[in-house]
Structures are given as C-alpha cells and as structure tokens.
Amino acid sequence: DSLARNRDLYEFIVNVSGGNVRVAVELVSRYLGSPNVESERIVQTITETGSYVVPLHEFAKAALLGDYSHFQEESSAATNVFSVVYRDRREHFLSLLILGFLSWEGATRAQADGFISLHSTISEMQSGGFSPEQISAHIQKLTRRKLIESSERRLLETGQEILESGLPDSFRITTLGAYHLKRWVSEFSYLESMSFDTPIFDDRLREELNSPRTWQGSDKAHPSSMLTALVLRSTKALAWKKAASRASPGATSDSKGGTM
C-alpha cells in the first residue's frame, strides 16, 4: 500500500537496490527491525486508522543508520560521498564530480551502453586540479560501494587487485550512484548523517562550530545544520562552475543511469 501511494518511496527502493530483489527485501527488513523507527507509533496508527503509509524520510533514515544512532558506512545503504583520502578541502567534492561526469551526456562514451573511458574521467578530474592518486582512490571506493560499475564488473575491493590488474578501462554510474547524486546529497537527513563522518579542514569554520557562542539562542540550529548549508552551497557552486565551463546550445544533462 505504501509503495502504491508513495512514489518517492518506490523510487528510493528501486534505485538504491539497483533493481535487485534481494537487496530490496533487505531494505524493507532493515526498516522493520530498525531501532531508529518508532514501531509503537506505527502500530498505534494502524490500530486507530487501519493503515499506515511509510514516509520516505522514515524509511531512508533506517537505510542510512541501520542499527546505529550515527552513520556507519560499512553497515549503511548509503555512502559518504564527501569523504576524503588526503587532507585536501577540495577532495570533499571529488566523488560527486566523478558521479556528475559519468552521468553527463556530453562525456565521450567508450561503449554504446553508457560506459565512459577511464582516461576521459581521469583527464576531466585532473583539469580540476586533482592528482591521479586521489582520482584512483575515489574511483575504487565508488566501485566498491556500487555507486559506479566497471565494464569488467570488478568491485576493486583490494589494493592488491589494482596493483596486479590495474583499473578497468571504463566505468558508468549506477542507479544507486545516481540517487546519491540527484536526490540524497540535497536532503537534510543524508547531510546530517554525513556530518558526523566528515572531517572539517577549514580552521575558521571548525573554530566557529566549536564555539559555544555559535549555538547560543533558540534560533541556532544543530551544528550539522551549518555543515549542511556549507555543503549545499559548495556543491551547487561547483556544479554550476562545471556546467558553465561546458555550456553550449542544446546541451543536455540527463543520464541513462539516472533515477527512475
């Protein structure tokens, strides 16, 4: 009933599961058994009204947090796309830039089924000032977390595998990656969860967050709200900068791997 009446919930399950029935069932099971879901309230609502429509934010919270009170990536359906490997503030957005490039119709396709060559991806990211080591590390993580997939269907789970075989020749974004890019990163619940797992390299901002004066008064929000606003502004600024640099008449930005 919830899937029939809540299109956003249906979109979430289909895209996060990648169309895999087993993963979809796991998402539902995780929601039903999550300590972050108010089960008593749901049972009471069903008792009083005879039905309960699961809201997207409630279902997504269970997928984000699982059995924990704070985000733990290895046990979550979500990936922290703002994580870094090196102490570089710009790197917070490297995973998003890779996802954005792989979903861009203007990128040179290596194959007819949406794969983009590794060379094109690395060249594009290097034009933004990122090193091959940074780019490779993020590609490896995005592949392991199934936000992108390689033409060779390798998960790149170990550094030894990369040393022995190198990176695959081409990649494309998955529905899970597209959902992160086009939906999750603009939602407060996702950004709030990631704020506990994302280092802050800006000394001024870190001092401001740590200052008691920052949060005095009822009009001040949770510290993660400031990080949320900062991430949203920075992400949109980077996206617009990239879009402007590529802009041409008739250009499109829809993706074959976009959300359903």
Q: What are these model-predicted stretches?
A:
Residues D1-N6:
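The catalytic "switch" region of P-loop NTPases
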Residues D8-R22:
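A short helix-loop-helix "switch/interaction" segment in the helical subdomain of ASCE P-loop NTPases
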Residues N20, V54-E58, N210-S218:
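A short, terminal or domain-edge coil/loop segment
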Residues V21-A24, P132:
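Alpha-helix N-cap/helix-initiation sites
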Residues V23-H119:
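Winged-helix-like regulatory helical subdomains adjacent to P-loop NTPase cores
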Residues G106-M260:
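Terminal-proximal interaction/regulatory segments of ATP-powered molecular machines
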